[in-house]
A protein has these predicted regions:
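C-terminal transmembrane-helix exit sites in multi-pass transporters
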Residues: 35-41, 63, 106-131, 256-276
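Juxtamembrane helix-entry segments on the extracytoplasmic side of multipass membrane proteins
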Residues: 18-26, 64-69, 127, 142-167, ...
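Helix-helix packing/entry segments at the starts of transmembrane helices
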Residues: 25-27, 84, 98-105, 171-194, ...
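Hydrophobic/small/kink-forming positions within alpha-helical transmembrane segments
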Residues: 3-6, 37, 76-81, 85, ...
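Glycine-/small-residue-enriched transmembrane alpha-helix faces in small-molecule transporters
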Residues: 1-26, 32, 147-174, 182, ...
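Specific transmembrane alpha-helical segments of multi-pass solute transporters/efflux pumps
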Residues: 3-4, 8-9, 41-49, 54-103, ...
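Intrinsic disorder in cytosolic terminal tails and internal cytosolic loops
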Residues: 48-61, 292-306
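Hydrophobic transmembrane alpha-helices of multi-pass small-molecule transport proteins
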Residues: 36, 122-143, 190, 196, ...
Length: 306
């Protein structure tokens, strides 16, 4: 998951040279949604054939409640439509390393919101870590990327996407105690893909698809299957088993992979300020982890409704 998401920044950045960001992502999301819906249907058929003897990753027998349906709807809008809208729009307007480093503050955001919701008790080290991470982000988008310059708008859009992803991760945590990660991820993806495609429709029609190279088509398909389908599913399998706070820690390595790939492939410069900012973001996340003390145990596999 870490390697896929880290490399995906450069993949989509390169693809944007041939396909505008929103049409690219609309097609990517539609493809991922179709794959998810087909897989969910196959899992349901398999469950009936085996009388429900399947891994809770793919199927759980609990019926959807009215609250579940409402949650799936708004999580689809926030976690897929809005998140992808801001994330892709931001990456298109900033550097790969800037975007990845800002996303790297997600664990701190998730821990902070968890504390505000009463799910975690936050110690002084967490707040120190949050301050250190914010300082690192400032170095990246403030000094490292010429604050007020060409990348500022993109940096701010990526920051908004962090808010959307934090909301999505924490908001879906209770759903995957009753329903499989496959179902929750797939249904929210399908729900979010619809308004995204409608919003991007004028650009989709205006795009010269005949001029798109085979490389970019391959990148689009692989990004849909790996960065959206596989990685999203892995993310929520982890959330189901170890909880959102611990799962978010694995995203700490995404900026490192993204910066390395961008430096090698896209030849983005690794400035001292950017490297310092990266170090501060990671150090802040580490301090945040040390300062967290869970007030309630996070659900393990035996608590996940399987």
């Amino acid at each position: 998951m870490v390697v896929i998401w880290g490399g995906n920044y450069s993949v989509i950045k390169r693809a944007f040279l041939e396909i505008p960001p929103q049409p690219f992502n609309a097609i990517r999301m539609a493809l991922a949604a179709c794959v998810f819906l087909i897989t969910i249907r196959l899992a349901q058929r398999r469950a009936r054939a085996t009388r429900g003897r399947m891994s809770p990753i793919f199927y759980t027998p609990f019926p959807l409640t009215r609250r579940d349906r409402i949650d799936l709807f708004w999580l689809g809008l926030v976690g897929h439509w809005m998140y992808q809208l801001f994330f892709v729009g931001g990456v298109a307007r900033t550097s790969v390393s800037n975007g990845a480093l800002i996303i790297g503050a997600t664990p701190v955001a998730i821990a902070t919101v968890s504390a505000l919701l009463g799910r975690e008790a936050i110690g002084i080290l967490h707040w120190i870590g949050a301050a250190v991470s914010i300082t690192g982000i400032y170095l990246v988008i403030g000094r490292g990327a010429s604050f007020g310059g060409a990348t500022l708008g993109g940096d701010l859009l990526v920051m908004i996407s962090v808010v959307c992803w934090t909301t999505y991760t924490l908001g879906a945590a209770h759903l995957i105690k009753r329903h499989s990660p496959l179902y929750v991820t797939g249904m929210t993806m399908a729900i979010g893909a619809v308004p995204y495609a409608l919003l991007a429709l004028p650009q989709i029609i205006a795009t010269n698809w005949a001029a798109v190279s085979a490389w970019t088509w391959t990148a689009l398909v692989l990004s849909a299957l790996l960065a959206l389908c596989l990685s999203y599913l892995i993310w929520y399998i982890a959330v189901q088993r170890i909880g959102p706070a611990r799962t978010s820690l694995y995203s700490n390595l995404v900026p490192i992979v993204a910066i390395a790939v961008a430096a090698i492939w896209l030849e983005e410069p690794l400035t001292p300020v950017k490297l310092t900012g990266a170090g501060l973001v990671l150090a802040g996340v580490f301090l945040s982890r040390l300062g967290r003390k869970m007030t309630v145990p996070e659900p393990g596999p035996e608590q996940s409704g399987g």
